[in-house]
Amino acid sequence: MRLKNGCNIKTIHKVPTLEEALLAAKGKIMINLDKADRYFDQVYELLQKTGTTEQIIMKGSKPAKEVKARFGKYLDEVIYMPIVNLDKEDAKRQIDVFVEDMRPAAFELLFVKDSNPLPRMLADSLKGESLIWYNTLWDTMAGGHDDDMSLANPDEGYGYLIDVLGCRIIQTDRPAYLLDYLRKRGLHD
């Protein structure tokens, strides 16, 4: 299997195995294993083999009780980050339970529109408890403050998430652009 370029043409670059990717990243970066919860027993064996358990962020949208039952034996070694859809009726309660039971390092928060008051409230209530992570890949994940908005007006995109919603982690498809913006604002070395 080969990687494709922006024109959907196969390149000479081979798609690495998870083990190869873990070894390449070892000691350099945090690794977001999105959707790995379904296979985490097998993934964990690779993490131990490669010595990368402390670099892993495992995310999921299951309730705290289920996370503790299913992944409890791993939670001292890997970072578990809950994904909470703030447009759901029980979102605030889910967050409160996670903070009380698991004290997560961060939450990935999702919401479709700025009319939802919860993102602003959480900027204050999670301060000092957990970091806030927003995903800017699509306009439906961070109230429209996505990568595309940020290209046109970075203060309305990334800046809004940082300044108004207390975001400290941004998942983006435009890392160089985001880093440039953060450096211009004195928020990154």
Where on the chain are the PLM-derived regions?
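C-terminal active-site rim and adjoining tail of enzyme catalytic domains
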Residues: 10-11, 83, 88-189
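Metal-dependent phosphodiesterase/phospholipase catalytic core, i.e.
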Residues: 1-88, 101-105, 109-112, 128, ...
